[in-house]
């Protein structure tokens, strides 16, 4: 049934070459002149970029510069790239024990729907999904499957460099639990462990999902 749906989408989905002129003009109004000319001519593929960038979460901060890098790479192969939409990204490491954690699983569906909104404009010939971590990758995966007639590639953000060794972090936590280290010492240890952009420095769901999409190609 799914494959039949995708075949139907291939034949029934309106391609940008079939969009009304007003629709198409809206779709490339903000593009650079060269990209605008390419999209007018229909001679080059247009690739959607769906990004989960935010600069609060270490795993998603690197995506700030990805769209420009991707556009340059696409230009080198005579294609165009547009950021079609952004999706939310949250971290259980921040919300754990707080009310915000109640939104964690729900965010997967929100991410899928947010990506679908961006792809719904029918301007694209393929899609790149910029996301990592345990709710973001599944949400983007759901969107990629819903738009399975568009070739898709997932782009992980990469791991955080190793910081404070886990044994040392555990030692400081134990001292804090025993009342032998204060909150400032504990915070310094945690900050030395999670200390830079990239996915968390342990084998958790962020790195697991990153490896899954890389293994899948």
What would you call each of these model-derived segments?
Residues 1-217:
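Metallocofactor- and cofactor-centric catalytic cores in central/energy metabolism, strongly enriched
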């Amino acid at each position: 049934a799914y494959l039949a749906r995708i075949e139907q989408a291939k034949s029934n989905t309106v391609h940008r070459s079939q969009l009304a002129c007003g629709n198409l003009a809206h779709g490339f109004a903000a593009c650079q002149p060269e990209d605008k000319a390419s999209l007018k001519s229909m001679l080059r593929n247009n690739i959607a970029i769906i990004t989960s960038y935010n600069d609060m979460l270490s795993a998603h901060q690197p995506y700030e510069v990805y769209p420009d890098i991707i556009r340059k790479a696409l230009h080198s192969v005579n294609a165009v790239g547009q950021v079609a939409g952004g999706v939310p990204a949250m971290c259980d490491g921040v919300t754990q024990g707080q009310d915000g954690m109640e939104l964690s699983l729900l965010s997967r569906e929100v991410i899928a729907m947010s990506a679908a909104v961006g792809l719904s404009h029918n301007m694209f010939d393929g899609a790149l999904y910029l996301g990592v971590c345990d709710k973001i990758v599944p949400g983007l995966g759901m969107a990629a499957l819903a738009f399975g007639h568009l070739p898709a590639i997932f782009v992980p953000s990469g791991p955080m460099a190793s910081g404070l060794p886990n044994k040392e972090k555990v030692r400081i936590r134990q001292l804090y639990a025993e009342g032998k280290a204060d909150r400032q010492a504990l915070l310094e240890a945690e900050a030395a462990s999670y200390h830079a952009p990239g996915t968390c420095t342990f084998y958790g769901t962020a790195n697991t999902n990153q490896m899954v999409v890389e293994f899948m190609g």
